[in-house]
């Protein structure tokens, strides 16, 4: 069955291929064979799949990578998230990943690394493995090639655990779909139904599933650099409205475009997907800019209200800086895939905890660390429950600041101009303001030469 799936994928490629493309792909396949020949463990296989297909997508589909924000997650991060979720499930709900009715969803599965590593983690007991695989693991992917790879990857991991002689079972928990589109319209589950008739049934089943855990690496791309890039992000009316209503209302900056970044949409969609009566856990590795950005104050305030506990492991790596600050931020977790700061965020919605605001725990990985050093630290910590990981309690101020809290002294200063024009009751220095000397014709009205200026003025 794995061969059949792979052959279907190859047939689709071959139907559109030309000789030049085939030659390039042949070289790619040769490199896969050479690198895979010496791999003898599950972690190594996952690592090579991530590295090869990350390189493949960047080379073959650069615009798709930019539009969808495709970056593949290091194994150390994946394992940290999986074990953190299991530990927090025990702490908050007295349940484990292995337990019945703990449905787990990876909404942006890519090559299926999160579900595959979950199967390989040993956290699912052998007696629960078949039930979990057949009924309680769910994944979505919108890129066709990645969808096929993920299906094969997950199926292969499951059958490796079963051993020889067991009947082959396909993984029916994966859907070829746009996660954000689910819930937008009643027809959303019909996506790709003509090509894949079973897909609609899978999407319908997933929408009915009582999801308790959502994990993954959501897309990051906020916007295209130019209209000519043809890499614009799709809008989602209902989801965008929810973001505007819940995350946008406390924002005082004029530019709130970053609130519609796909990773913020992922948090909003996932929050709405969890059932309020049962609660659950969301754990994403994502752009970490939301922790400090002024434009995300509404997002911070909202998750503080909607969840009972929040863990933020800041991996830093902001390379949209320069000089000493850039060196201090350290290596980029995703290498060349992203220049933004990265954070692992775990959100707990426990309906039994009656509190208006979440407890917030924060850990900064540290200064001047290389990418390899950061991944080594993540591997060593293993989970948010590790006592070696020293959490700092965060108590946001009324402005929604989590880090670098602003001083209220500025608000006591006398302003130069009134908030409202011509407000005679304003305690400002000036009541009236104007644009000053404003000609609308500066090239004609100013000149270093008195003679030339005189000529210009006489011609006006």
Which sequence ranges carry the predicted segments?
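Intrinsic-disorder/low-complexity, polar/charged segments
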Residues: 37, 41-44, 93-95, 143, ...
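Eukaryote-specific, cytoplasm-facing alpha-helical/coiled-coil scaffolding segments in long proteins
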Residues: 12, 77-78, 82, 140, ...
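Short alpha-helical "patches" and their helix-cap loops
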Residues: 2-11, 72, 97-102, 284, ...
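Alpha-helix initiation and N-capping motif
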Residues: 3-6, 22-25, 45-50, 115, ...
């Amino acid at each position: 069955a794995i061969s059949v799936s792979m052959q279907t994928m190859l047939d689709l490629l071959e139907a559109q291929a030309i000789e030049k493309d085939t030659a390039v792909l042949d070289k790619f396949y040769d490199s896969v064979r050479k690198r895979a020949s010496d791999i003898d463990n599950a972690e190594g296989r996952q690592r090579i799949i991530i590295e090869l297909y990350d390189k493949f997508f960047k080379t073959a589909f650069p615009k798709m990578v930019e539009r969808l924000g495709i970056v593949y997650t290091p194994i150390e991060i994946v394992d940290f998230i999986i074990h953190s979720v299991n530990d927090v499930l025990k702490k908050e709900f007295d349940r484990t990943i292995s337990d019945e009715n703990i449905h787990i969803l990876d909404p942006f599965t890519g090559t299926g690394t999160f579900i595959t590593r979950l199967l390989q983690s040993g956290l699912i007991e052998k007696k629960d493995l078949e039930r979990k695989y057949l009924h309680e693991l769910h994944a979505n992917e919108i890129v066709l090639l990645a969808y096929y790879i993920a299906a094969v990857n997950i199926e292969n991991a499951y059958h490796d655990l079963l051993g020889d002689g067991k009947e082959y079972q396909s993984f029916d928990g994966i859907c070829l779909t746009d996660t954000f589109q689910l819930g937008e319209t009643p027809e959303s589950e019909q996506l790709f139904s003509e090509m894949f008739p079973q897909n609609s049934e899978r999407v319908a089943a997933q929408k009915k599933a009582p999801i308790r855990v959502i994990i993954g690496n959501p897309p990051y791309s906020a916007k295209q650099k130019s209209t000519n890039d043809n890499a614009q992000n799709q809008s989602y009316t209902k989801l965008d409205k929810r973001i505007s209503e819940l995350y946008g209302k406390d924002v005082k900056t004029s530019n709130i475009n970053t609130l519609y970044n796909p990773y913020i949409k992922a948090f909003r969609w996932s929050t709405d997907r969890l059932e309020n009566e049962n609660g659950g856990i969301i754990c994403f590795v994502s752009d970490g800019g939301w922790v400090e950005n002024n434009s995300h104050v509404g997002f911070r305030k909202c998750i503080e209200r909607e969840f009972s506990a929040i863990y933020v492991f800041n991996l830093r790596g902001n390379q949209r800086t320069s000089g000493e600050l850039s060196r201090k931020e350290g290596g980029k977790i995703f290498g060349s895939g992203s220049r933004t700061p990265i954070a692992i965020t775990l959100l707990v919605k426990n309906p039994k905890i009656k509190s208006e605001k979440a407890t917030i725990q924060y850990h900064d990985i540290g200064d001047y660390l290389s990418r390899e050093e950061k991944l080594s630290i993540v591997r060593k910590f293993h989970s948010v429950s590790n006592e070696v990981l020293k959490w700092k309690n965060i108590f946001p101020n009324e402005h929604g600041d989590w880090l670098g809290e602003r001083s209220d002294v500025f608000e006591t200063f006398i302003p130069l101009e009134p908030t409202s024009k011509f407000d005679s009751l304003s305690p400002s220095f000036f009541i009236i303001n104007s644009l000053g000397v404003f000609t609308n014709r500066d090239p004609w009205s100013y000149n270093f030469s008195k003679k030339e200026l005189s000529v210009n003025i006489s011609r006006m």
